[in-house]
Curated annotation (Swiss-Prot):
Changing residue 364 to Q: Severe loss of oxidase and hydroxylase activities. This is a copper-containing oxidase that functions in the formation of pigments such as melanins and other polyphenolic compounds. Catalyzes the oxidation of o-diphenols such as dopamine. Also oxidizes monophenols such as tyramine. Coiled coil: none annotated. Its EC number is 1.10.3.-, 1.14.18.-. It comes from the Eukaryota. It comes from Anopheles gambiae. Signal peptide: none annotated. The lineage of its organism: Eukaryota, Metazoa, Ecdysozoa, Arthropoda, Hexapoda. The gene is PPO8. Binds 2 copper ions per subunit. GO terms for cellular component: extracellular region. This is Phenoloxidase 8.
């Protein structure tokens, strides 16, 4: 009997193959009512059942090969078939974009349809009917959101998009070679197909120095999964999450800071905000990605192209540059006035408590934006204008560039310029807020006596970080449609950092045991020319490495914290774990939380070594406490910094990015000035060195 996880994973696997074809490497069969077949296949339904159904020779072969009967999912007929016309206008093999308002609306309605089903079994039946009639990425997105938000499916892991649509992440040449390998070579003899490290440009393009970041599979999966956990449209109980708008700000602010830090290390300058949409876009990008659903490429952008108004009737999409130019002054006026106006005329303060959260939902135009008509859709429509810069009117029947998808947008250098522009709007609001007071920053109960790091190995170097290349493998069989059964491994090379530990010595003067919060940030020192950065620049580029609760006894406490326990990251297995492991119930492979990929915890640095300031503070738990129960060592609670906690409030009442999210008081000219008055803070100088060597990741 199929488990709930197997039923739903079968619906998600091989998204372009009809559901009547066997799934799970030929071991899972769906027994469908005949009227569930699409118009193409219903006239030959009996023939298909004889060839591919639960009683077919294919099913018998499974028993002969494994000695175990195949798993059969019997789909029950529905008394009333759901009306899917709200979504069927998006063609099954066309592109799908959460930045397109009409696509987003269809996704919200489909999510609601799935959420409204009375139980998980009925959801399986309804999803089985809808699957082959709808756009494949749309179906995957809506069903995944529903699985994450239904009480009766929360034990079902959502497979990584890499395993469902690998074409959005890997060199298309690798897919051709995978199909060749699968057609000719027996499973036990197949070799991983290597994906080149640099296949989108040569070193003649300076921006290619950052391809390791922009085109990292884990980084792009993080962006996709964040938008899965925090959908902008759908039923209110799905969209309305604690501090959703602030998380939109903070997650993007942190990835921009990480990107900028590595730009400096690679000899590249500041990210220039894309503030003028009428100027030519100097950056080019040739993504080298192919949508296998229709064999159309993600279109490139040539150097110096000019953004135009978008009017594409087939996509039900109409966006004018003037729209953004009219919305933006209203947003800035609200910031400068200190309040925004809701659609019912109420003034909503943009204060230190909720201001950034309100502003985040306004800029993303989520379903809980307080006034979508007045403040518009600045963020999403910027993505749309850039995604269709090559064919704004659909004259040449070209689909969008990578800026049109949440799983691909971060590959493009222009993503960072656009988001730097958006980030500056948030910073305008943050600049209005008063600096933190001494009472807010201090902790009279503790003294942070010492801070250092050490590489986690015998005799490991102190205050020294090491990064290097790592070659890993991932099995993409669940996303390769109409291909031979068996494994489909690719190998890819990505950044990795050597494991390390933090060592803190904390003296507690309290008379009893107490709990506090340790916050750890990394701050750059120099720009690309080796010149010192101002404190303001360093504050804005402080990247969060960890935050954790600590139990302190009276007197001296020696705290050791593993880098792998970071509250920012998720482990490799949760980013890349395969569908087969999840079907088997492997808890380590459950894709239950979003988070920054662990292999990107540290910046890359360079071979000469880059110096940073490591900052730690011990803040008062009573000021942080959000009265929420969570276990930092549990699989879904361990990476909350960018993603919060599932179904619970954010675990800290402090502003995200505290204490660097606000300007400092007058007189602070350096990080040392900032730390000096506070015995609960400490700095350490650390050096990050990149080793240009490739180490294979151990495989099981």
């Amino acid at each position: 009997m199929a488990t709930l996880t197997q039923k739903f994973h079968g619906l998600l696997q091989h998204p372009l193959e009809p559901l009547f074809l066997p799934k799970n490497d030929g071991t899972l069969f769906y027994d469908l009512p005949e009227r569930f077949l699409t118009s193409r296949y219903s006239p030959i339904g009996q023939n298909l059942a004889n060839r591919f159904g639960p009683n077919s020779p294919a099913s018998s072969q499974v028993s002969n090969d494994t000695g175990v009967p195949p798993t059969v999912v019997t789909i029950k007929d529905l008394d009333e078939l759901p009306d899917l016309t709200f979504a069927t206008w998006i063609k099954r093999r066309d592109s799908f974009s959460l930045f397109n308002p009409e696509h987003r609306k269809a996704a919200g309605k489909l999510t609601k349809l799935f959420l409204d089903q009375p139980n998980a079994d009925r959801l399986v039946d309804v999803a089985a009917y809808a699957r082959d009639r709808l756009n494949a990425p749309l179906f995957q997105y809506a069903l995944s959101v529903a699985l994450l938000h239904r009480p009766d499916t929360k034990s079902v892991s959502v497979p990584s998009l890499l395993h469902l649509f690998p074409d959005q992440f890997i060199d298309p040449a690798a897919q051709v070679r995978m199909m060749e390998e699968g057609s000719i070579v027996l499973d036990e003899n197949r070799m991983p197909i290597p994906i080149p490290m640099n296949y989108t440009a040569t070193d003649a393009e300076p921006e290619q120095r950052m391809a390791f970041f922009r085109e990292d599979i884990g980084v792009n999966l993080h962006h996709w999964h964040w938008h899965l956990v925090y959908p902008a449209s759908g039923p209110p109980d799905v969209v309305r999450k604690d501090r959703r708008g602030e998380l939109f700000y903070y997650m993007h602010q942190q990835l921009l800071a990480r990107y900028q830090i590595d730009r400096y290390a690679q000899g590249l300058g500041r990210i220039e905000p894309l503030a003028n949409l009428r100027e030519p876009v100097r950056e080019a990008y040739y993504p080298k990605l192919l949508r296998t659903s229709n064999n159309r490429t993600f279109c490139p952008r040539y150097p110096g192209m000019t953004i135009s108004d978008v009017a594409r009737s087939a996509d039900r999409l109409e966006v004018r540059i003037a729209d953004i130019e009219s919305w933006l002054p209203r947003v800035l006026e609200a910031i400068d006035a200190g309040f925004a106006v809701s659609d019912d005329g109420v003034r909503v303060p943009l204060d230190e408590t909720r201001g950034i959260d309100v502003l985040g939902n306004i800029l993303e135009r989520s379903a809980i934006s307080i006034n979508r008509n007045l403040y518009g859709d600045v963020h999403n429509m910027g993505h749309v204008l850039l995604a269709f810069i090559h064919d704004p009117r659909g004259t040449y029947l070209e689909s969008s560039g990578v800026m049109g998808g949440v799983a691909t947008a971060m590959r493009d250098p222009i993503f960072y310029r656009w988001h730097k522009f958006i980030d500056n709007i948030f910073l305008r609001n943050k600049a209005r807020l008063a600096p933190y007071t001494m009472a807010e920053l201090s902790n009279s109960n503790v003294t942070l006596e010492a801070l250092e790091t050490q590489l986690d190995r015998a005799g490991g170097a102190v205050n020294s970080f090491v990064t290097f290349w790592q070659r890993s493998q991932v099995d993409l069989r669940a996303g390769i449609d109409f291909s031979a059964a068996g494994s489909a491994f690719v190998s890819f090379t990505h950044l990795q950092c050597a494991p390390f530990v933090y060592r803190l010595r904390i003296n507690s003067t309290a008379r009893s045991n107490r709990q506090d919060t340790v916050r750890i940030f990394l701050l750059p020192r120099q720009n690309e020319q080796g010149r010192p950065l101002s404190f303001e620049d360093r504050r804005l580029l402080a990247i969060e490495l960890d935050s954790f609760r600590v139990n302190l006894r009276p007197g001296m406490n020696n705290i050791v914290r593993q880098s792998s326990n970071s509250s920012v990251t998720i482990p490799f297995e949760r980013t890349f774990g395969n569908v087969e492991q999840a079907n088997a119930g492997n808890a380590q492979s459950r894709f239950c939380g979003c988070g920054w990929p662990a292999h990107m915890l540290l910046p890359k640095g360079n071979a000469n070594g880059v110096e940073f300031d490591l900052f730690a503070m011990v803040s008062r738990f009573e000021d942080d406490n959000a009265n929420v129960n969570y276990d930092e060592n549990a699989g879904c609670d361990d990476s909350y910094a960018f993603c919060g906690l599932r179904d619970r409030v954010y675990p800290s009442r402090r502003a995200m990015g505290f204490p660097f999210d606000r300007r400092a008081s007058n007189g602070v000219r350096s990080v040392a000035d900032f730390v000096a008055p506070y015995k609960n803070m400490r700095l350490a100088t650390v050096t990050l060195r990149f080793m240009n060597t490739i180490i294979d990741r151990p495989t099981n």
